[in-house]
């Protein structure tokens, strides 16, 4: 084999040889054409040699590129956000729902000696200071809309009714006592029996721990704040209230244990930029009982009485029969500046009046406290022989064990303020209202932009009560004190022209004016009968006050709709100290609580992205990879084949799973509805049990009464005083009433009413049970449908055929893997076969040898031989042995153009077969060469005989060209 050809095939480089003799130049001069360079044309083209000749890898790369593109498209489609419904146990958005009608909420008290007072033991409910759950500000704002409402709780009313009923039942027995009080009653009446109010699950109490007030619904005509709302910013859920007296009769001051709770009720304004904040007294502080609140509801109207005993807490008629028409503030009184039990400047009041600094005070000389009259300075206390409870007064012997001569100003005291003008956002000060004849026209004394909603833009230069045209239309009454201090602005929509026309129609006022004559401190008109017009009792316009028995009626003025009416209230505020009993004390303290119904969890349907969890796993795996690795195409093909098989086998299973999941979600949702219906049944059953227990307690009380009467009759019979006297005196005591008073169920005190109520509960419970049973049955049916759907789906798709086909999957997989393995082996062995063919195939090359000979002068006829003898002899002497063949094969492997390690490793395996091939080819080539030599000699001799060597300048010979490497 030609080594030069082998080298060119392995390296792609050209290897050619030009053999030229010395006589070539002379031949050119004689016109001979020079010999052309013998340029070698390789058997394999350069274009193919410059690239990979393995077609297998090229086609495989194209195939894998197309599959990768398809997979990326499918992956992009799957990465789109798509949601899937999940039915799960989710938390309620708020966790609770507010209860507006608190009268139907079951409640019990917790205290010591619970059996004695009809309460539960202290451990029955958790301590609210330890067990509570904070509620976020966003949830409280969303539920209550920054409006913490007023609630008239029935629990304090029930307690007051119990004490009231006991007093009436034992009145005759109490009259027989002179110097002692019935055992245990003294503590109850004095409010020393303390406890908590608790509600059972699923109810709870939402306790506000931080709040403030703000104004709403401001009237542009009068400037009044129609509503003052309370914004609770922090709250917590508890089961019980704080510790408070269970009951108490009317009292002036309370225990130190209640100071903190009472101080919390002094609510401050939310806005620090209100005008009242800049005034000396600041803004109003306290709890605002709203307009329209009912202190005693209609269901307990028998407790209202005739006249209100709570001071400023009253309706427009001074009673409690109607809702409140004015806002009432209740706060912990600040008595630090009081002197001898009286407010500041009390000694400067006029003619012994009860009004000072714009406030009309209630009774301060002798305050009622637990049946005693207390002096202002605490130097004396007198027993009145009667106690006040609610709106009633009882003649009851009561001897407390406290020192009534102490200074009561050291203890916490409730102060009630009834605000008539309701302009708390403008000023917290109260004023004395002017009479109508003191209202004049302010000629140049008022400047600025004045209105009922803008007091800061108005200025006055002289004390008085001046009419002024509002910048928004209508009339204003501006009260100016101390020549520059604006204390009040009252307004009306009636303009000056309308008012002046009414004024001129008054009798004797045709030529009168409202100019200030300067009489008195604040001035006034010249003729009192021509004062600012108003409507009298007959709803007719008049300018003169009413005259009776030589006395002139005092006419005052107010803002808004009452600007033209007859007003008798001289002061804008009414205030009193004390005069509250345990019921109202509890009612005020309970306003920091709202009754809620807890619903911690419920069933619901939520939407979650389908690839949510998968995306997180993929992202986590990508982060864990520090280097990108090159994936093998064979592995990807295997993965795609397996995925295709699994997809084909699981396509129908996916359809079945989707349908099954749909029915499952519907079944679970129906089950959730059935659970809610069963919850309603439990609540109705609980209410019915309460009703039954109520009847049992009523029956217990009646049986106890009958037993007491029977006991008394038997006692009379034993004493032999039957029918002889109308009364019987005995030293034997019969203790009765060791039971709880249940008369708060007055509307159901008869058996007929109780049975009607029980029948109503039974009907409601029956309906709820039917609904619950229907919902439960529907849930069971939908749950049973799930396997039926599965069976029907198998029948439609002929699952037996699909599953019988699955048994061929292993054979198919093994066959595919075998084909892939065989193809890979072929692709690896193909270049080895090509290399071996290149190295083992002999290649022949035609070489033209140009030889220039001289003329034979000495001996033409001499025979020097054929010129090949020496060469042939040398050729014959060089035999190809196995060692030479191994050396040549190893040298070829060392000089191979492939430098990559894996290619050189593959070529190393070809050294042994190449050695055998060289040795065999050498042995066969020697035999072939001997045959060619014999034939060449015969031809040479023949040509030499016919033509003659001297006549042939150039001889053409065939020979083997041997490379230096061989």
Swiss-Prot record:
Domain of life: Viruses
GO cellular component term, pick one: viral envelope
Glycan-bearing residues: 101, 134, 179, 220, 231, 334, 351, 357, 382, 403, 407, 438, 443, 449, 459, 469, 483, 495, 505, 511, 529, 536
One of the protein's GO biological processes: virion attachment to host cell
Site (Cleavage): 632-633
Post-translational modification: Specific enzymatic cleavages in vivo yield mature proteins. Envelope glycoproteins are synthesized as an inactive precursor that is N-glycosylated and processed likely by host cell furin or by a furin-like protease in the Golgi to yield the mature SU and TM proteins. The cleavage site between SU and TM requires the minimal sequence [KR]-X-[KR]-R.
Region (Immunosuppression), start-end ranges: 699-715
Keyword presence, Glycoprotein: yes
Entry keyword set: Cleavage on pair of basic residues, Coiled coil, Disulfide bond, Glycoprotein, Host cell membrane, Host membrane, Host-virus interaction, Membrane, Signal, Transmembrane, Transmembrane helix, Viral attachment to host cell, Viral envelope protein, Virion, Virus entry into host cell
Signal peptide range in chain numbering: 1-83
Spans through the membrane: 802-822
Membrane-side (Cytoplasmic) residue stretches: 823-966
Coiled-coil zones: 665-715, 756-791
Stretch list, region Fusion peptide: 633-653
Membrane topology (Extracellular): 84-801
Function in brief: The surface protein (SU) attaches the virus to the host cell by binding to its receptor. This interaction triggers the refolding of the transmembrane protein (TM) and is thought to activate its fusogenic potential by unmasking its fusion peptide. Fusion occurs at the host cell plasma membrane.
Subunit structure: The mature envelope protein (Env) consists of a trimer of SU-TM heterodimers attached by noncovalent interactions or by a labile interchain disulfide bond.
Protein name: Envelope glycoprotein
Record organism: Caprine arthritis encephalitis virus (strain Cork)
Gene for this chain: env
């Amino acid at each position: 084999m030609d080594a030069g050809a082998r080298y060119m095939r392995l390296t792609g480089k050209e290897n050619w040889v030009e053999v030229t003799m010395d006589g070539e130049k002379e031949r050119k001069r004689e016109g001979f054409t020079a010999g052309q360079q013998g340029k070698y044309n390789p058997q394999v083209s350069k274009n193919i040699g410059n690239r990979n000749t393995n077609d297998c890898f090229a086609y495989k790369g194209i195939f894998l590129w197309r599959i990768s593109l398809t997979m990326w498209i499918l992956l992009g489609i799957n990465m789109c956000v798509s949601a899937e419904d999940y039915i799960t146990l989710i938390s309620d958005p708020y966790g609770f729902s507010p209860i507006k009608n608190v009268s139907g909420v079951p409640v019990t008290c917790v205290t010591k000696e619970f059996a004695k007072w009809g309460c539960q033991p202290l451990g029955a409910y958790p301590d609210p200071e330890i067990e509570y759950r904070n509620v976020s500000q966003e949830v409280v704002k969303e539920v209550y809309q920054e409006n913490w409402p007023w609630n008239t709780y029935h629990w304090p009313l029930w307690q007051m009714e119990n004490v009231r009923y006991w007093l009436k039942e034992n009145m005759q027995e109490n009259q027989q006592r002179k110097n002692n009080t019935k055992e245990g009653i003294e503590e109850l009446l004095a409010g020393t029996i303390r406890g908590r109010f608790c509600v059972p699950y699923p109810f709870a109490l939402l306790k506000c721990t931080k709040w403030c007030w703000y104004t709403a619904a401001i009237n542009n005509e009068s400037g009044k704040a129609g509503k003052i709302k309370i914004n609770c910013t922090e709250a917590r859920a508890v089961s019980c209230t704080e510790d408070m007296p269970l009951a108490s009769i009317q009292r002036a001051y309370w225990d130190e244990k209640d100071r903190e709770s009472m101080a919390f009720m002094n609510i401050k304004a939310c806005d620090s930029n209100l005008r009242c904040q800049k005034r000396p007294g600041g803004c109003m502080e306290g709890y605002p009982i709203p307009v329209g609140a009912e202190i005693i509801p209609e269901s307990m109207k028998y407790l209202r009485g005739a006249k209100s005993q709570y001071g400023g807490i009253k309706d427009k008629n001074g009673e409690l029969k109607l809702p409140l028409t004015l806002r009432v503030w209740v706060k912990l009184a600040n008595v630090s500046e009081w002197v001898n039990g009286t407010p500041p400047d009390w000694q400067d009041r006029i003619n012994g009046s009860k009004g000072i600094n714009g406030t009309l005070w209630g009774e301060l000389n002798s305050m009622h406290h637990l049946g005693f009259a207390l002096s202002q300075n605490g130097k004396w206390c007198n027993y009145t022989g009667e106690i006040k409870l609610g709106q009633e007064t009882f003649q009851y012997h009561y001897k407390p064990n406290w020192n009534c001569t102490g200074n009561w100003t050291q203890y916490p005291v409730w102060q009630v303020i009834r605000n008539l003008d309701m302009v708390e956002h403008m000023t917290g000060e109260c004023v004395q209202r002017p009479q109508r004849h003191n209202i004049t026209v302010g000629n140049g004394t008022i400047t600025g932009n004045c209105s009922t909603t803008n007091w800061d833009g108005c200025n006055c230069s002289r004390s008085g009560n001046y009419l002024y045209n509002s910048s928004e239309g209508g009339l204003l009454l501006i009260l100016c004190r101390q020549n520059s201090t604006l204390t009040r602005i009252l307004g009306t929509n009636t303009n000056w022209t309308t008012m002046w026309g009414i004024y001129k129609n008054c009798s004797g006022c045709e030529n009168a004016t409202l100019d200030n004559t300067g009489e008195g401190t604040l001035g006034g008109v010249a003729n009192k009968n021509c004062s600012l017009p108003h409507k009298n009792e007959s709803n007719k316009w008049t300018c003169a006050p009413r005259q009776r028995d030589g006395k002139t009626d005092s006419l005052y003025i107010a803002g808004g709709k009452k600007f033209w009416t007859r007003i008798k209230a001289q002061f804008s505020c009414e205030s009193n100290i004390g005069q509250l009993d345990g019921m109202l004390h509890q009612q005020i303290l309970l306003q920091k609580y709202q009754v809620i119904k807890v619903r911690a969890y419920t069933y619901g349907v939520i939407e979650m992205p389908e690839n949510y969890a998968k995306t997180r796993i993929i992202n986590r795996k990508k982060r864990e990879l520090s280097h990108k690795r090159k994936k093998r195409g064979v592995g990807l093909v295997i993965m795609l084949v397996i995925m295709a098989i699994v997809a084909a086998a699981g396509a129908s299973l996916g359809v079945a799973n989707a349908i099954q999941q749909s029915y499952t979600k519907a079944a679970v949702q129906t089950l959730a509805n059935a659970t809610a219906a069963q919850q309603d049944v439990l609540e109705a059953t609980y209410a019915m049990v309460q009703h039954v227990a109520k009847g049992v307690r009523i029956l217990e009380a009646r049986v106890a009464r009958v037993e007491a009467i029977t006991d008394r009759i038997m006692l009379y019979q034993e004493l032999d005083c039957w029918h002889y006297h109308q009364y019987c005196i005995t030293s034997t005591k019969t203790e009765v009433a060791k039971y709880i008073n249940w008369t708060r169920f007055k509307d159901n005190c008869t058996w007929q009413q109780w049975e009607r109520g029980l029948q109503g509960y039974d009907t409601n419970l029956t309906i709820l049970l039917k609904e619950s049973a229907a919902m439960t049955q529907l849930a069971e049916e939908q749950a049973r449908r799930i396997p039926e759907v599965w069976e029907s789906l198998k029948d439609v798709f002929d699952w037996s055929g699909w599953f019988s086909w699955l048994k061929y999957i292993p054979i198919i997989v093994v066959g595919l893997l075998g084909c892939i393995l065989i193809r890979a082996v072929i692709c690896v062995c193909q270049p080895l076969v090509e290399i071996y063919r290149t190295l083992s195939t002999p290649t022949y090359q035609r070489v033209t040898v140009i030889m220039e000979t001289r003329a034979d002068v000495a001996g033409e006829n001499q025979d020097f031989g054929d010129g090949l003898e020496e060469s042939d002899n040398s050729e014959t002497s060089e035999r190809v042995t196995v060692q030479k063949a191994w050396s040549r094969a190893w040298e070829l492997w060392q000089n191979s153009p492939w430098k990559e390690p894996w290619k050189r490793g593959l070529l190393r395996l070809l050294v042994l077969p190449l050695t055998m091939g060289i040795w065999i080819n050498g042995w066969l080539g020697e035999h072939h060469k001997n045959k060619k030599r014999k034939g060449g000699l015969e031809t040479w001799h023949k040509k030499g005989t016919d033509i003659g060597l001297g006549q042939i300048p150039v001889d053409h010979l065939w020979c083997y060209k041997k490379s230096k490497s061989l």
